[in-house]
Amino acid sequence: MHRRPSLFKACVFLFAASAAAMGVAQAADSKLDSVLARGKLIVGTGSTNAPWHFQGADGKLQGFDIDIGHMIAKGLFNDPTKVEYVVQSSDARIPNLLTDKVDISCQFITVTASRAQQVAFTLPYYREGVGLLLPANSKYKEIDDMKAAGDSLTVAVLQNVYAEELVHQALPKAKVDQYDSVDLMYQAVNSGRADAAATDQSSVKYLMVQNPGRYRSPAYAWSPQTYACAVKRGDQDWLNFVNTTLHEAMTGVEFPTYAASFKQWFGVDLPSPAIGFPVEFK
């Protein structure tokens, strides 16, 4: 005698079928699919912070963040120009992701645990820190010379509640002069009112690229922070794709593009990734 399938078995079957259908729907709803269907990538970024994102003489956005956007577009469409940049304030970097105004934010976003509760961070593409800018003819050669100078050393810094504390992490006895703008800070170095300026290492390197032979920087930096792009949480396919693109830009087939951008904006020749055993597994 044949028995009818039990109600329990039927419910299990329906649940499994529903779960499978939901899985297919979720995969189809990935940002990766919608970006590919649209035919262009929409990147949130800034426009006033060289060498990361700023307007060139032709009015077009340029900088390292902009180049990162082009690299992701190339990964998507094999065409780095298929990208639209939405200029946004720093405060809008996360809200614009959450409201789907942009597909990704690449705007020198510092990775923090609290921000990671709101967005998903990609692989980091730069490690920032505080560096020192000195005139090329400075009597101070390295950080030890500057430490030995004690309070006879004057360091210019952009005005900030933590400015003095930050400088004293590296130069405990230095005199710290604070300025209202970056231009005034650099003028203090140029005029000799300050022996050095302490600012983002990326800014130090960029200024040296823009003014060959005028400045130099000791081989020392401190207060590290990580920069990454950010995407909306909950879309692993999209995050995986962006991470794959960035990974191959920094270690694989697209390394020449990443290295050329790094050289252009920071004046640094990156060593080629080691061939053989993947370095990320060491």
Where are these regions (language model features)?
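Periplasmic-binding protein-like
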Residues: 47, 126-137, 201-246, 268-282
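Short helix-initiation/N-cap motifs at beta->coil->alpha
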Residues: 83-95, 141, 159, 177-187, ...
